[in-house]
């Protein structure tokens, strides 16, 4: 099933929208050592859609991040170093995992929309759609990801559920997850950086200090 941005939301959708962070969710099975997970993945996604009254499911997949690397060549360079240290067995298992993820996307395409564009990351796709919910005629959107960077997109119509913590993050419980206001999220990330993506912050400024500076 294929939907372009131009046709998304036409005809008027039924229910809410579910945006799935494709690879992020797949790592749930990798961490469990499961390499045959495509059917479990599909069932999980459809179960979540039912829970959140989502009539439309969109699975987003990474297509690279060339424009980010053009700005910061060191972006995610730490991950290459990590993979370079893999043993032959780990390399084999990772290749098998990625192959199964590809099979999973193929399976999901039979019933749902899978969006992947060259040079665009999954969260870029999620950002574009979630910021244009009215244009696409959706009332609410639930993002499925354990990546807290996606919290930048949260507003009164957009929320996130983590399959790792099994917790929801919304505008209504924001203060249960963070010690600063929702509109200060970008400032917080600029101050602290992102170790996972190898993005530096202000030297000597950790999360606690960042919150103090924003008060």
PLM segments and residue spans:
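Extended two-metal-dependent nuclease catalytic cores across DNA- and RNA-processing enzymes
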Residues: 2-5, 9, 15, 54, ...
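Domain-level signal for Mg2+-assisted phosphodiester chemistry and nucleotide/NA-binding surfaces
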Residues: 2-107
